[in-house]
Amino acid sequence: MQYQIERIDHQIADDRSQTGTFLIGPLERGQATTLGNSLRRVLMGGLEGSAVTAVRIAGINHEYATIPGVREDVLDILLNCKQLSINSSNPELEIGRLVASGPLDVKANDIQFSSQVEIVDGEKPIATIQEGHNLELEIHVERGVGYRPVDRKNQETTAIDLLQIDAVFMPVKRVNFSIDETAVAEGGTGRERLKMEVVTDGSTSPDDAIAEAANQLIELFQPLATVTMVEEIPEEPEPSPEAQIPLEELNLSVRAYNCLKRAQVNSVSDLMGFSYEDLLEIKNFGSKSADEVIEALERIGISIPQSRTSV
């Protein structure tokens, strides 16, 4: 069944975050929930994004310090850097730098990055420098997926003045969806429409976010469309060493031995296919000979059933 996707609203906030609202339908009953849940999960946790992962501040070696002549303390500056909406097209580490003198209200646009890094909200405040004081920053930006907490073990091996930050790479901030069950197709059969609201940090548009999420789901399900089921053939169990013992080594009487040989019984393996009743049906094979065979098998740890297995 073909369905349509319509963007019914698109807004850009003062902080450059974007909100897109989409209608998807008509869908069969139940499909809207399937689509909504799948897209929401990928949108919120599966898309790659950019984030500040570490900050170096000249003269500072721990996050609880204060900076002379700067209104904000180090924790405030780290939080402001963490909240930056950034889009880096470089899969490798990018480093931005700031050297500023007061009086100055430092904003995100004051940080110098390469052409591969775009600061979405350039007016985001970073710090306030008083007259006669300086501030030097080095900001590390990386690409990633999801949320990456500070690695405390790795932190011990990094430079003492490089302050690591819990990185939030998720470009989508919020996803809401609802289902409209009022649509009715020809013939009176029920239909659904999925209404999705996607809010991004501005580093990507809601349209691109949905497209990327859909492509990830396609890649996830594609192998299932071409899977070939191969029936496993069970391996034949290897016979036990006792089953390989030839009939001669059971030390049977001549009468019992000859009767079994005429019945094409040449080894213990052949005897294991017989029951006590089967032995009695061998020509000239009486109960005494059958008991003799049972005892010989029990001496090597093998037993056979008294009667045939019923089918």
From Swiss-Prot:
Q: EC annotation?
A: 2.7.7.6
BP term (GO), one: DNA-templated transcription
Where are the annotated segments for Alpha C-terminal domain (alpha-CTD)? 239-311
Checking Gene3D superfamilies in the record gives: 5' to 3' exonuclease, C-terminal subdomain, DNA-directed RNA polymerase, insert domain, RNA polymerase, RBP11-like subunit
- Which GO MF term does the entry hold, naming one? protein dimerization activity
Region annotation (Alpha N-terminal domain (alpha-NTD)) maps to: 1-228
A GO cellular component annotation here is:
cytoplasm
Provide the reaction this enzyme catalyses: RNA(n) + a ribonucleoside 5'-triphosphate = RNA(n+1) + diphosphate
Assembly: In cyanobacteria the RNAP catalytic core is composed of 2 alpha, 1 beta, 1 beta', 1 gamma and 1 omega subunit. When a sigma factor is associated with the core the holoenzyme is formed, which can initiate transcription.
Q: What HAMAP family is this protein classified in?
A: RNApol_bact_RpoA (MF_00059)
NCBIfam families, per database record:
PRK05182.2-2, PRK05182.2-5, rpoA
Family recorded in the similarity comment: Belongs to the RNA polymerase alpha chain family.
Quote the entry's note on domains.
The N-terminal domain is essential for RNAP assembly and basal transcription, whereas the C-terminal domain is involved in interaction with transcriptional regulators and with upstream promoter elements.
State the name under which the record lists this protein.
Answer: DNA-directed RNA polymerase subunit alpha
Q: Which organism is it from?
A: Prochlorococcus marinus (strain MIT 9312)
Gene name, per UniProt, is rpoA
